[in-house]
Structures are given as structure tokens and as C-alpha cells.
């Protein structure tokens, strides 16, 4: 089984804290953490982070026939990109959106 783990704009600059774990992880630490869990489950991963909407769409389109699923953190595009949603619907690969914060608990414009 293979998943595309796709991260959008500014995700590479965020810091993460996991309940029960001391301190924070930077983006590379978080991806190492995710990779470790996937390795334990025998899941192969292809990880990509980009700040460009078109690159996210290109990765989604290229996923068809290449991966079994997509895990997407679209960053700020979660609220604004119809094009990313269209790409996900058209590519035929099961996908899940992962957000690190709840949009309804953030700024009103989101």
C-alpha cells in the first residue's frame, strides 16, 4: 500500500506539539514521525510539500494509478481552492483532508 502525503503552503514552517510528547516538532520532525508510523504499518509513502496551488494539483493528478490514497493538508487552500477539490474528485484516488487547526476556531475570514 502506498500513500501520497501532500502538504500545502506554509505547512513547512509550522511547529507541532503532540499530547504526551515533550516539546515541539518542526516540519521535518513531524514527517519523520508520520513516516515512522507508516513504516510500522507497512505503508509506503511519497511526501511532498509545496507553496503553489498548481503544484498541489499536478501532484494530485499524477497520483492516479500510482498511489492507493492521498493524505492532504492543503494549508490555507482548505478554505479557498475549488481547483484542488476538483482535482481530488477527478483523480479517482481516495483522499482524506487533514487540518492541524479547526478552521471555524480561526480568523473569521476563513
Predicted regions and their residues:
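Extreme N-terminal starter segment of soluble prokaryotic enzymes
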Residues: 1-4
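N-terminal nucleotide-binding beta1-loop-alpha1 segment
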Residues: 6-11
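Glycine- and acidic-residue-enriched helix-capping/strand-helix junction motifs
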Residues: 14-28
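Short beta->alpha junction loops
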Residues: 44-54
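Hydrophobic/aromatic beta-strand patches that form the interior of the parallel beta-sheet core
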Residues: 48, 71, 96-98
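Short acidic active-site motifs
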Residues: 55-59, 80
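Short acidic/histidine-rich motifs immediately flanking catalytic phosphotransfer sites
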Residues: 63-70
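Flexible, gly/pro- and Lys/Arg-enriched active-site loops
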Residues: 77, 82-110
Amino acid at each position: 500500500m502506498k500513500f501520497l502525503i501532500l502538504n500545502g503552503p506554509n505547512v513547512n514552517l509550522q511547529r507541532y506539539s503532540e499530547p504526551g510528547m515533550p516539546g515541539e516538532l518542526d516540519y521535518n520532525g513531524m514527517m519523520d514521525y508520520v513516516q515512522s508510523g507508516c513504516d510500522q504499518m507497512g505503508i509506503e509513502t511519497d511526501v511532498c510539500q509545496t507553496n503553489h496551488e498548481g503544484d498541489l494539483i499536478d501532484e494530485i493528478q499524477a497520483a492516479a494509478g500510482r498511489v492507493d490514497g492521498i493524505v492532504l493538508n492543503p494549508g490555507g487552500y482548505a478554505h479557498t481552492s475549488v481547483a484542488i477539490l476538483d482535482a481530488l474528485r477527478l483523480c479517482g484516488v481516495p483522499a482524506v483532508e487533514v487540518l492541524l487547526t479547526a478552521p471555524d476556531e480561526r480568523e473569521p475570514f476563513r
